[in-house]
Amino acid sequence: ATRHVLCDLSSFNPRRIPAATIGWFSPECTHHSSARGKKRQEQFGPDLFGETLPSEAAERSRATMWDVPRFTEAHRYQAVIVENVFEVLQWVMFDAWLLAMTSMGYRYRIVSLNAMHAWAQGPAVGQSRDRVFIVFWKAGNRAPDLDGMLAPPAWCERCGQMVAGEQAWKPGRSAGRYRAQYLYQCRVCHDVVEPVVLPASSFLDLTNTGTLIGERTRPLKPRTMERIRAGI
C-alpha cells in the first residue's frame, strides 16, 4: 500500500516515514533560479497563468531541495535519486547541497535524460520533457549502471540498422537539454542519430472530440474568462 501524507514538508519529521533502501525525491522545481543570483520569477515575470509567488513563497519552494539531505540523514538510504529540471543545476545553493550529501558518504552522478527517450524499462513518453537525475550511492557500494538507461533505440543511416544511441556532449558540456547541450550518436560509426520517439497520438484519445465552449452547460470560471478576453 502507498501512504500519502498531506503536510508542510519543512516541519515534517522524516523518522515518521518507514525506513527504505532507496529514497526517490522530486523537489518542487517551479521557482529554481535560471541564472546564479537571479530569481526565476524576477527574471522571467509571471507564469503561464499570470501568477507570481511572493519571494518568501518562492524561497520555500526552492527550500524543498534541502529536505533531500534531511530525510537522507534520518534514513541513510543505500541509494538516493533526485529528479528535477535542468535549472536546478544553476541554483546558487546547488554546490552546497551536493556537499551536504557527499559529507554523508555518498558518491553521485548527474544524468540528463529526455522523457521521450526513456525506453529502458518500457515504452517512452510521447512528449519532450528534459530532466536531470542526480543519483547518489553509498561510497563503497558498486556504482549503478546508468549507461543502460541512456541508450535509446535509434536508426543509423550509415550502418543501415537500428542501434543503441549514445549521448554525445557538445564541447564543455556534461549536463543539459537534448539538442541544446547533447545529441545521440551511433556507437559504431559515431554518426549523429535521432532516437525513436512516440507520437502525441500514442496517448491521445482521438475519439473524444471535446466540448465547444459555446456548448458548455456550466459557466467558465472568472479567471478563465479573463484569460479568454485577454487572448481576444
Outline where the language-model segments fall:
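Conserved active-site and SAM-binding loop architecture
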Residues: 1-232
